[in-house]
């Protein structure tokens, strides 16, 4: 496993500083070791996860200029941990309501010595919770409150929930083609830029939606 991770990370991230490459490798080794017992990532295929999830996270990183970030429903730490590794001067808060994910994220933070990472066991929809970062991230976020909503209404609900936290100026969503099918009314209600991720590894499309609050 470690050899496959090392070879693929070296291929995909050949232009990154060696220290960041090493941290990504160490993170992924921990991720797949934990995944083998706790199922915390979308695929057991190391090459797929690196070329899809980690690569896309690295592209997302280039869009974020603010100094503090909250990754909502961080799960196994994608994209939040990757953003923290690539941006050591930015404060990255990872929140999730499941103890399995929180325990793993705490281990990663400790073993990789990521001083810019804050891990919180937190329900995003808790009315008493307020985000203290300048931007918020969502990727494959799920919760029973929004499970039966279509994509547009789910997106509206997430944005309106974030807006209750006055410090947040932008919301980023790493998503697929449904973001291209939002109604005219949605675009009248929200200012949003959508950027396609140009991946050399996959023909299927992924997008970064940037919503200005």
Indicate where each model-derived feature is located.
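Conserved SAM-binding motif I beta-strand of class I
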Residues: 91-96
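Sterile Alpha Motif
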Residues: 1-3
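Generic detector of well-ordered alpha-helical packing
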Residues: 57, 72, 97-98
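Conserved class I S-adenosyl-L-methionine
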Residues: 66-75
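Class I SAM-dependent transferase core
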Residues: 5-66, 104-115
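N-terminal cationic-hydrophobic initiation segments that often serve targeting/anchoring roles
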Residues: 32, 61, 84, 162-163
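S-adenosylmethionine
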Residues: 97-213
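Conserved SAM-binding loop of SAM-dependent methyltransferases across substrates and taxa
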Residues: 76-88
